[in-house]
Each structure stands twice: as C-alpha cells, then as structure tokens.
C-alpha cells in the first residue's frame, strides 16, 4: 500500500509500505554503508531512530544468525530505495522483511533516498513519521533510551586476564567479543551502576560502551567515570568516548547530521596514519572545550575535522569516537583493544610491585 515519510519541517516523501506495521516515529537519520544492514538495525545506538539506507538495493543477502549485534532490532523504522525480496546468501535464514515484521518495525520502500539524504545533509536530522496517512502528526516521546537498551542486571563473560568493569550503555556484541578475545574477564554492568556496585568486583580497568542519545543524559555514567579517572585505566568507544570527555570537563555538541556508516575516514594524529572506520553517532566532542594542557586530540575525521579520539596526557584514559571492532566495516583499527590490554597489564604490574 502507499506509504509516506513525513518530516517535522512538513516535507513528505512517498513510497510503498511493505511491512505489516504501518506506522513508526523517530529521529530520521541516514547511514552510508553498502552492506551491514543487519548489524545496523540491531545496533542499540540506533534506538529511537528511523534509519535511511543510502545504498539503493537492500535485503539481497537476507538475515543470518551470525551478524546480530544485540538480541533484537532497536530502530523505529526502516527506509530503502529498493527492497530485494529474493535474498541469496548461503548463510541466509530469513528475509530482512520477515525479520522486521516479526519485530513490528515499519518498512518503507520506493523512497527517493538520494533526495532525502541530501535534505538531511543540508537541513540536519529531523524527527519524522512513517505512515499510511500524510495528515498524521509527528509524536515526540521522551523514552529513556539508555534504560531501553542497557542490560537489566549484571553478568559475566569469563576470561583469563584482568577484570574489566564494562558499563553497558547499549553495547554491540562485537565489542564484547573483541575485549574477551584479547583476554579480559568481563563484568557487565547496567548504565546506571554506582561506584559501590562496580567496586564489588575491584576491577582492574573500566570500559564505557557505545549507545544511543545525548551523552549529557548519561548522568550516572558521567559521575561513575569521574570516580575512576586517575584510579583505574579507562577506555570508551562512541558514546563512551563522549562520556569520558564530559567527565574530563569537555563539552559535547549535537552534529548537523552525524556520522553513520562503514566508510568514515579518520586520521591518527600520533602515527600520521589514515583509517577507514565504522561509525554511528550524532554528537561530537567540541574541540574548543578540550583542555590541551591535559588532553591530547589523537584522532580527527578527515571529512569534517571533528574530534574522533582523545587521550589524557598523564593518566591511563583514552577514547575513540569510531567503532574499532567494526561490525560492520573495516578492521583497520582493532589494535586498540590490544593497546588497552597492554596499558592495563602495565598499570596492574606497577601496583602489584608497589604493594609487595
């Protein structure tokens, strides 16, 4: 049946509603990956958003059991130029549409995604609605996205190495797998875990995950991070990067249209190397707010010059805006997990010998 994407500025894009669910509200964003739609729709960082795929043909390899980044999709809607209803892949177990229908996600096909993406680039991300009735009003909900995507109770992923307190702000499975693969004994905590909660395991290091929304809303995680800076090694990715920056006294700002996709170029200012990275964020650390006497900018985005990584000059604290674990995307910078392990082991040995 005929369907529409209506934006908050009144713009309407017409297409075909191909899903069982005919209505969905959310912030309309675009992602530029040619592949990786399964990872994108199950990435908790997309919670509360209607995702527009810029690549024109989506669904051609179906859905498999290996590429999920969480237990369910977190998007509010899915928009494509053309949907492939006959997937072909040896791992495919069901079609993309079948999967989204099973989770009540509205899907709009036949949209001029090129024109839509251009509009979002020029005017910024907007709230919108997928609907069968263009007269419908756009709703604005106040859902606590962190509560929606974070684990409800602590759990452990056993490893042979140092104990890592992992603050789940809406993590992707790929991050947990990478940290566990380098040896961390991971204890996962909810987004609102307290200092006392975390200290029950006496961790060797702290990790802050990716996640959705405005980093300034993550008040509990910011306060927790302040406690551990200078006390334990700390690493953050994506939202975790922004939270570390806020805990260090920096500011974050909402971007015009964000970075979403598996092809974002980043320069490592310490090594002068360039990487192609996977990203998914709508906020950035404001460079002007960084105290350069204490904090070094380690990475920048080559498209717009925004901050992609920071490191404290005197403390074992660093973070990156991009996703080094990829899922989907290039694995140019997976060595960050080994680097973190090295820092934690050095820090741990130093305190061991100090106690002896």
Curated annotation (Swiss-Prot):
The active site is at 238 (nucleophile), 323, 325. The keyword Disulfide bond does not apply. The keyword Nucleotide-binding applies. Keywords: Amino-acid biosynthesis, Arginine biosynthesis, ATP-binding, Glutamine amidotransferase, Ligase, Nucleotide-binding, Pyrimidine biosynthesis. Pathway: Amino-acid biosynthesis; L-arginine biosynthesis; carbamoyl phosphate from bicarbonate: step 1/1; Pyrimidine metabolism; UMP biosynthesis via de novo pathway; (S)-dihydroorotate from bicarbonate: step 1/3. GO terms for biological process: 'de novo' pyrimidine nucleobase biosynthetic process; 'de novo' UMP biosynthetic process; glutamine metabolic process; L-arginine biosynthetic process. HAMAP family: CPSase_S_chain. Belongs to the CarA family. Small subunit of the glutamine-dependent carbamoyl phosphate synthetase (CPSase). CPSase catalyzes the formation of carbamoyl phosphate from the ammonia moiety of glutamine, carbonate, and phosphate donated by ATP, constituting the first step of 2 biosynthetic pathways, one leading to arginine and/or urea and the other to pyrimidine nucleotides. The small subunit (glutamine amidotransferase) binds and cleaves glutamine to supply the large subunit with the substrate ammonia. PANTHER family: CARBAMOYL-PHOSPHATE SYNTHASE SMALL CHAIN (PTHR43418:SF7), MULTIFUNCTIONAL TRYPTOPHAN BIOSYNTHESIS PROTEIN-RELATED (PTHR43418). NCBIfam families: CPSaseIIsmall, PRK12838.1. This is Carbamoyl phosphate synthase small chain. The gene is carA.
């Amino acid at each position: 049946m005929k369907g529409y994407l209506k934006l908050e500025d009144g713009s309407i894009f017409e297409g075909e509603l191909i899903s069982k669910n005919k209505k969905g509200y959310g912030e309309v964003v675009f992602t530029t990956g040619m592949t990786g739609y399964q990872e994108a729709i199950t990435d908790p960082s997309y919670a509360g958003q209607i995702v527009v795929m810029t690549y024109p043909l989506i669904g051609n390899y179906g859905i498999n059991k290996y590429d999920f980044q969480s237990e369910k999709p977190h998007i509010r809607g899915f928009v494509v130029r053309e949907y492939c209803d006959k997937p072909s892949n040896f791992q495919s177990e069901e079609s993309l549409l079948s999967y989204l229908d099973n989770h009540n996600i509205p899907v709009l096909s036949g949209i001029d995604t090129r024109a839509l993406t251009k509009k979002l680039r020029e005017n910024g991300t907007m709230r919108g609605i997928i609907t069968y009735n263009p007269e419908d009003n756009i709703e604005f909900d106040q859902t606590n996205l962190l509560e929606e995507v974070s684990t409800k109770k602590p759990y452990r992923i056993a490893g042979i190495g140092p104990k890592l307190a992992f603050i789940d702000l809406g993590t992707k499975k790929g991050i947990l797998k990478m940290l566990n693969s380098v040896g961390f004994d991971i204890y996962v905590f909810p987004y609102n875990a307290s200092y006392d909660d975390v200290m029950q395991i006496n961790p060797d290091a702290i990790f802050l995950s990716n996640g959705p929304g405005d980093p300034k809303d993550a008040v509990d995680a910011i306060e927790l991070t302040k406690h551990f800076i200078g006390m334990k090694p700390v690493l953050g990715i994506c939202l975790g990067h922004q939270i570390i920056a806020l805990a260090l006294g920096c500011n974050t700002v909402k971007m015009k249209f964000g970075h979403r996709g598996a092809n974002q170029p980043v320069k490592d200012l310490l090594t002068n190397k360039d990487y192609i990275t996977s990203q998914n964020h709508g906020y950035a650390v404001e460079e002007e707010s960084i105290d350069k006497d204490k904090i070094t900018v380690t990475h920048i985005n080559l498209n717009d010059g925004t901050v992609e990584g920071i490191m404290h000059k005197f403390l074992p604290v660093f973070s990156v805006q991009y996703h080094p674990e990829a899922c989907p995307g290039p694995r140019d910078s997976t060595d960050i997990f080994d680097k973190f392990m090295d820092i934690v082991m050095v820090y741990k040995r130093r305190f061991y010998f100090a106690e002896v």
